[in-house]
A protein has these predicted regions:
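Extracytoplasmic catalytic/substrate-binding loops of multi-pass membrane glycan-assembly enzymes
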Residues: 191-203, 211-227, 234-239
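Transmembrane-helix motifs of polytopic, lipid-linked glycan transferases
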Residues: 246-267, 305
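Transmembrane-helix signature of polytopic, membrane-embedded enzymes
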Residues: 84-95, 173-175, 259-282, 301
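Specific aromatic-rich, kink-prone transmembrane helix
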Residues: 140, 208, 300-318, 335, ...
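Membrane-interface alpha helices of multi-pass inner-membrane proteins
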Residues: 327-342, 353, 382
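Short acidic/glycine- and proline-prone juxtamembrane loop motifs at membrane-interface regions
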Residues: 288-299
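Membrane-interface anchor segments at the N-terminal boundary of transmembrane helices
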Residues: 51-68, 239-243, 491-579
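Membrane-proximal stem/loop segments at transmembrane-domain junctions that anchor or position
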Residues: 396-526
Length: 623
């Protein structure tokens, strides 16, 4: 009885902490509360902190009271129960990360630093309490989700209606494909012949002006431009642009449909299949971004295929038959596409190849050597071809190397922030060495906390020795002020894990930016009204709660982290092989040049989310 009372008290304390955290995040502007005065004695300090509390508390309203009651009711009705075979740490560690990024993300969002946490004792205390509130709420939510998914894993599919059978069983590939096309057709019509972005046109300029380099993936540059040429031969460049849109949509929708085909094999509950279809059809970011002609869409399609193929490989690893020629060809093609359509795709392929080959050897290497060799061939061939393409073919064709600067965003941002904050400590020798690599004289002014592009574009090192000298200086400065370096990296990458950062309707307006180009791409004036309506529809859908979670980088990243933690805790580590491309994709985002609400960088993870619930349920059915 005493233990039950203690648990009840702890539960209500957790509920109160969660209420406080949410109320502060929704109402208080902590950036407007100045640091406390250093002098004045105890009573003056106490009065100052009470004044700061007044700044927070009066913002609460009857709506906040109603919301607080809902939180209290949630904690009262949802007990903290754990599946027997999932250790509690599997939810607690992701909850710690979620709370950490919510607290630190808030500070970086408003001050580009962690000053709102470490400004003074008052801010630190508020941050600790808010962190605790977010943590207990995240733990309760995560365990509720995992418990529900584990429960569904133990249930068998009930009988379904005629239309469900037709959609998900009889026509498991074509059915979802048709539904997605129906829902996406207004977006396709509104953006005809397709929306563009500056990088798209820059790729075509490289092709037509004969100055191709590997800043943009040459494979996509050539494919894009050849289809433009084909369209021109058939009548117009507008048609060529539309052919590019058709090709990338065909790749992406085929990947989605293959996911539904696999969910049929996995016997995924129909509820999760409908949810997956609903996410793809109704989340405006999916069709809005997919109708922009860009390298990210075919790249994302290949990554979705790769994740699904790896998932099926893990599921069927113990089958006696080796991989068929069709399976090997599929893996080779998607690996080539993943590495060919984005430069960082090579990292996804290499990690996936190592993970799949190593896992295959550990499970069937001695028992079924023939099947393991088929896995080895399926991944070794694309890796060899990719390396030959990048290291031999492209240089032989005169494709210029863009240099290492794309991979150096983290140290460059750390150096720029160091120069801005501790420029007086930089010696003349250090300044000279940095100046041989970056524009030292203007580095402090060029530094943008949320993107490395302004600094990165000043890279001009001519020799490897200059770069090595720079890294020596960078290491010295890192040791002198490590906190400054951590701040620089977090400031540039926190948004990938910050759940309050939403896409700002990126590429919302249909447009073709064709300045200084040799072709004409025309959007029909008759479709102007359709474009206007669909723009408003997309903006409306982006504001629908729950639906807009699936276009939130922080949400999808935390979902991936949660599944990884549960798989590890539940002894299902083999399924990390399936999501290894997504894990690497998130790491690439961290090392990349910017967050700045450009969700296309994390699209591979976002577009795989509809199938992760089905994959998780399938994994938890296995002994």
């Amino acid at each position: 009885m005493r233990k039950e009372n203690l648990n009840s008290v702890i539960n209500w304390i957790c509920a109160a902490l969660a209420c406080f955290a949410l109320m502060v995040s929704m109402n208080a502007d902590l950036s407007g509360i100045s640091a406390e005065a250093a002098g004045g004695g105890l009573w003056t300090l106490l009065a100052a902190n009470i004044k700061k509390l007044e700044y927070i508390l009066p913002t609460f309203s009857y709506r906040d009271a109603f919301f607080a009651l809902m939180i209290l009711f949630f904690f009262y009705k949802v007990p903290c129960r754990w599946p027997e075979y999932v250790p509690r740490l599997s939810c607690r560690i992701p909850a710690v990360l979620a709370a950490f990024f919510l607290v630190f993300g808030y500070s970086f969002r408003y001050t580009n630093s962690w000053d709102l946490i470490f400004m003074d004792s008052f801010h630190l205390l508020i941050s600790v309490v808010v962190f605790a509130g977010y943590y207990v709420l995240a733990v309760r939510l995560f365990q509720m989700v995992i418990r529900y998914l584990c429960k569904k894993a133990q249930e068998s599919n009930t009988s379904c209606g005629k239309w469900t059978t037709l959609l998900f069983e009889t026509h498991a590939f074509a059915g979802p494909l048709l539904v997605i096309m129906i829902f996406w057709s207004p977006y396709i019509l509104a953006k005809f012949p397709g929306a563009s972005m500056p990088e798209t046109l820059a790729e075509m300029r490289q092709f037509y002006w004969g100055t191709i380099n590997n800043y943009y993936p040459p494979l996509h540059t050539i494919m894009l431009s050849l289809l433009m040429q084909l369209g021109n031969l058939l009548g117009s460049y507008t048609l060529g642009f539309f052919l590019n849109l058709v090709l990338q949509l065909a790749m992406l929708l085929s990947a989605f449909s293959y996911g539904f085909l696999l969910m049929k094999r996995w016997k995924t509950p129909y509820l999760f299949r409908y949810l997956a279809l609903g996410i793809i059809c109704m989340t405006q970011f999916f069709p809005m971004e997919s109708t922009v002609v860009e390298k990210d869409i075919p790249y994302t399609a290949c990554v979705v295929f790769l994740v699904l193929l790896l998932a099926e490989l893990v599921r069927t690893i113990k089958d006696s038959e080796p991989l068929s020629k069709k399976q090997i060809a599929g893996l080779i093609l998607v690996c080539l596409g993943t590495a060919g359509f984005r430069n960082e795709g090579i990292y996804l392929v290499l990690v996936s190849a190592v993970a799949a080959i190593a896992y295959g050897w550990s499970v069937i290497g001695k028992e079924n050597l023939k099947k393991w060799k088929s896995i080895l061939v399926a991944f070794l061939i694309p890796v060899v071809l990719i390396l030959g393409y990048q290291k031999v073919l492209l240089p032989a064709c005169g494709v210029e190397d863009n240099g290492p600067k794309e991979a150096l965003s983290i140290p460059f941002q750390q150096t720029a922030r160091y120069v801005r904050d501790y420029g007086a400590e930089v010696t003349a020798e250090e300044a000279e060495i940095i100046g041989k690599v970056l524009d030292y004289e203007n580095l402090a002014e060029l530094y943008d906390p949320i993107t490395s592009d302004p600094v990165k574009y000043t890279y001009h090192a001519e020799t490897t020795g200059e770069l090595l000298d720079y890294f020596r200086v960078w290491a010295i400065q890192l040791v002198k002020h490590p906190a400054n370096a951590v701040e620089a990296t977090m400031n540039n990458a926190y948004g990938w894990f910050y759940q309050e950062g939403y896409t700002q309707n990126y590429m919302m307006t249909s447009r073709i930016d064709g300045q200084d180009v040799r072709w004409e791409i025309n959007q029909p004036a008759k479709l102007a009204g359709v474009r206007q309506v669909m723009e408003r529809v997309a903006k409306l859908l982006s504001r629908v709660p729950v639906l807009n979670w699936f276009e939130n980088a922080g949400m999808v990243s935390m979902l991936l982290i949660l599944l990884v933690a549960v798989w590890i805790g539940a002894g299902k580590k083999r399924y990390l092989v399936a999501v290894s491309p997504l894990i690497v994709a998130v790491l690439v985002c961290i090392a990349g040049p910017t967050f700045n609400y450009q969700m296309r960088y994390i699209m591979p993870v976002m577009f795989c989310v509809p199938f992760l619930a089905g994959l998780f349920v399938q994994s938890m059915r296995e002994l």
